[in-house]
C-alpha cells in the first residue's frame, strides 16, 4: 500500500510528461527537426524529475494549507496550476545543478552520471542548462499570462535566480577547490552564501508562489514568510554542513566530502572562530587536502572544540526563535502560520 507521501509524489510526477510534451510542441512550432526535440526532451527528463522534489511539492502543500484544503481535495485543474509552478522551481534547480556539476567537475548526481558526463553531451550541457531555465518562462507565459499575478511571479523567478547566482559567485570566489585560503572564510560570509545560494530559492520561492496563486499578496504577508523562511533556510544549510562532517554514510546516504573539498561550511567557520593559534595552523595545513589523514586531523580539532555540541545548542536556539516568530504571525489577511510550522517540522532534527 503506497503511503500518502508516495501518492502525493506520484500525482505531482504525473504532471511532468505533459509539460515536456508542451515544451516540445513549441520546438515543433518553430520547425525544429526531430533530433533537436528529442535532445531537449531527454535533457528535461534526465535532469528535472530525479530528485526528492521537495521544493516543487512544497508549492502544492503550501497552497493547500492556504486554501484550507488537503492536497487530495484540490481539483485536478486547481492542482495542476500549482503543480506547474512547483515544476518551474524544479526546472530552476535542474538548471543550477547542470551548471554547478560542470563548475565543480562532479561525476555523479542523484545516482547517475552528471549530464555533462553523459556520452554525446559534454559541453553542450552549458546550452542545455540555459534551455532548462528558458522552459520556466515558456510555461509561465502559457499557463499564467492572463493572471493578475503573472508579472509578480515572473519577476520573482528572475529575482530569486539572480540571488542564487550571487550566492554561487560568493561561494566560488571564497572557497575555490584548488586554492585553500582560510583567511577568506568567516561565519558572516557563510551566512551570506547560504542565504543567497539556498534559502531564497529553496524556502521562500515555493511559499511566495503559492501565496500569489492563493491571492495572499500583501507585502506584509510576503515579509512575514520571508522573515521565517530565510533564517530557516540558513538553519537547513548549517544542518547539512553538520551532517556532512558528523553524520554516518548510512545515515546521510553519501560520504561527506566538505573537508577535502575546501567547502566554506559552518563547521570550519565555527572552528576558525574558536581555534587556538596551534589548532589554526593545523587547519591551515590540512583543510581542503584530498587526503584522509589530513581530513582526520581536521576532524580531531572539530571534536576537541566540541563543534558537535555547539551545533546542537545552535539548533535548539534557532528552533526556539523561529517558533516564537511563527507564534506572532498575523493571519488577518489570509496568511497562515501553519505554512511555516510545516516547513520547520520538515527541517528540525532531520538526520539526512
Swiss-Prot record:
Positions that bind Mg(2+) 1: 100, 104
Q: Which residues of the sequence carry a binding annotation for Mg(2+) 2?
A: 100, 104
Entry keyword Transferase: yes
Cofactor(s) needed by this chain: Mg(2+)
Q: Name one Pfam family in it.
A: polyprenyl_synt
Keyword field contains Ribonucleoprotein: no
Read off the InterPro entries from this record.
Answer: FPS1-like, Isoprenoid_synthase_dom_sf, Polyprenyl_synt, Polyprenyl_synt_CS
Q: Name one GO cellular component term.
A: vacuole
Q: Which CDD domains match?
A: Trans_IPPS_HT
Catalyses which reaction(s): isopentenyl diphosphate + dimethylallyl diphosphate = (2E)-geranyl diphosphate + diphosphate; isopentenyl diphosphate + (2E)-geranyl diphosphate = (2E,6E)-farnesyl diphosphate + diphosphate
| GO process terms (BP) | ergosterol biosynthetic process; farnesyl diphosphate biosynthetic process; geranyl diphosphate biosynthetic process; isoprenoid biosynthetic process
Keywords assigned by UniProt, alphabetized: Isoprene biosynthesis, Lipid biosynthesis, Lipid metabolism, Magnesium, Metal-binding, Transferase
Q: How is the cofactor bound?
A: Binds 2 Mg(2+) ions per subunit.
Disulfide cross-links: none
Ligand binding (isopentenyl diphosphate): 52, 55, 93, 110
Residues binding dimethylallyl diphosphate are 109, 197-198, 237, 254, 263
> Which pathway does the record list?
Isoprenoid biosynthesis; farnesyl diphosphate biosynthesis; farnesyl diphosphate from geranyl diphosphate and isopentenyl diphosphate: step 1/1; Isoprenoid biosynthesis; geranyl diphosphate biosynthesis; geranyl diphosphate from dimethylallyl diphosphate and isopentenyl diphosphate: step 1/1
Enzyme Commission code(s) on record: 2.5.1.10, 2.5.1.1
Query: Care to name a GO molecular-function term for this sequence?
Result: dimethylallyltranstransferase activity
- Role according to the record: Farnesyl pyrophosphate synthase; part of the second module of ergosterol biosynthesis pathway that includes the middle steps of the pathway. ERG20 catalyzes the sequential condensation of isopentenyl pyrophosphate with dimethylallyl pyrophosphate, and then with the resultant geranylpyrophosphate to the ultimate product farnesyl pyrophosphate. The second module is carried out in the vacuole and involves the formation of farnesyl diphosphate, which is also an important intermediate in the biosynthesis of ubiquinone, dolichol, heme and prenylated proteins.
PANTHER family (UniProt xref): FARNESYL PYROPHOSPHATE SYNTHASE, FARNESYL-PYROPHOSPHATE SYNTHETASE
Similarity field: Belongs to the FPP/GGPP synthase family.
The protein depicted here goes by the name Farnesyl pyrophosphate synthase
